[in-house]
Swiss-Prot record:
Catalyzes the rearrangement of 1-deoxy-D-xylulose 5-phosphate (DXP) to produce the thiazole phosphate moiety of thiamine. Sulfur is provided by the thiocarboxylate moiety of the carrier protein ThiS. In vitro, sulfur can be provided by H(2)S. Gene3D superfamilies: Aldolase class I. It comes from Gluconobacter oxydans (strain 621H) (Gluconobacter suboxydans). Keywords: Cytoplasm, Schiff base, Thiamine biosynthesis, Transferase. Its EC number is 2.8.1.10. InterPro entries: Aldolase_TIM (IPR013785), Thiazole_synthase_ThiG (IPR033983), ThiG (IPR008867). This is Thiazole synthase.
Length: 252
């Protein structure tokens, strides 16, 4: 449940860097995603054609503030996105480091506070830091989106312990792993940890077969979520035979 919206798909898909508009639409359909992210900058460059294209997908739009480095830039972009796309949903990105694309936690919390006060439903791109998460919730956010690894790196879940801790600490808060996912197995792993959804883009857009990869991610995320619900067996330090030793043949 994200801001009162119940989604059947746990995959959120980005819309940048695809080989063609047709491939993008086919990938969205193959993935089963119900939420797609969109950049206001791309919408402006396309002159409205991109928005018309996305309307064909019938997905819910999640505009983002990609490329923003200050509170002012992020807030202004969010306000414009609400007018252009007609939604209060906003994926809030305030980048603090150009090389790693790591979010600036101080600017992020301040921008979230401003936008939540203005009625936005904020999806903040953050790290797995628990204190930052607490501050974002205090600012009014009802969803947290910690990164798995730097955007576009494909490194997967670099800090498993931190993500586990975040899931345990924020038991009743929807959590979405956002950024750094490069393979379906990594997305499944995030869901097995108990996360509520995964947001990704580059892993599908830059695949040899984006449509096939989108389908693979959709299935992997569903499998990971079902595995978590079913209950994963606990890890052991030592072996534990699954076959009983009683009834073994006695050899002379």
């Amino acid at each position: 449940m994200f801001y009162g919206v119940d989604l059947t798909s746990r995959l959120m898909l980005g819309t940048a860097q695809y080989p063609s508009p047709q491939v993008l639409l086919e990938a969205i359909e193959a993935s089963g995603a119900q939420v797609i992210t969109v950049s206001l900058r791309r919408e402006g460059a396309a002159g409205g054609a991109f928005r018309a294209l996305l309307a064909k997908s019938r997905c819910r739009l999640l505009p983002n503030t990609a490329g923003c480095h200050t509170v002012r830039e992020a807030v202004t972009t969010a306000r414009m996105a609400r007018e252009v796309f007609g939604t209060s949903w906003i994926k809030l990105e305030v980048i603090g480091h150009a090389d790693t694309q790591q979010p600036d936690p101080f600017a992020l919390v301040e921008a979230a506070r401003v936008l939540c006060a203005e009625g936005f439903d904020v999806f903040p791109y953050t790290t797995e830091d628990l204190i930052v998460g607490e501050k974002l919730l205090e600012a009014g956010c009802k969803v947290l989106m910690p990164w798995g690894a730097p955007i576009g790196s494909g490194q997967g879940l670099r800090n498993l312990a931190g993500l586990r801790s975040m899931r345990a600490h924020f038991r009743d808060v929807p959590l979405v792993v956002d950024a750094g996912i490069g393979a379906p197995s990594q997305a499944a792993q995030a869901m097995e940890l108990g996360f509520d959804a995964v947001l990704l883009n580059t892993a599908v857009a830059k695949a040899v077969d984006p449509v096939g990869m989108a389908r693979a991610f959709g299935r992997a995320i569903q499998a990971g979520q079902e595995g978590f619900v079913a209950g994963l067996m606990p890890e052991r330090d030592m072996a534990s035979a699954s076959t009983p030793v009683f009834g073994l043949a006695e050899l002379a």
